[in-house]
Amino acid sequence: MKYIIVIPARYKSKRLPGKPLANIGGLPMIVRTYNQCSKVVSKSKILVATDSNKIKKVCDEYKIKSIITSNKCLTGTDRVAEVAKKIKCNFYINVQGDEPF
């Protein structure tokens, strides 16, 4: 059974722009979300999907696998669906990028 956790992360949120990079206790929110996921699965099974080069850069700095997706995705689920077209798995687990705890 092949699966991955996909963490969709959008930089241009309407209510809180840049939310995935918000500092929470010294770490960007997206890094905290990734760290929580890594407690239950191998880091090789986690991927951040984003339309933002800023988020991609932070992921690179923390050695988090990431992929740039279209800025036309309206929802996180749309972003996961785009990943599914590029990476073949049996299951895609969608963990929202604003779940740092």
Which role fits each region the language model picked out?
Residues L47, N53-F101:
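Short phosphate-binding loop-to-helix
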Residues K2-A49:
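N-terminal glycine-rich phosphate-binding loop and ensuing alpha1 helix
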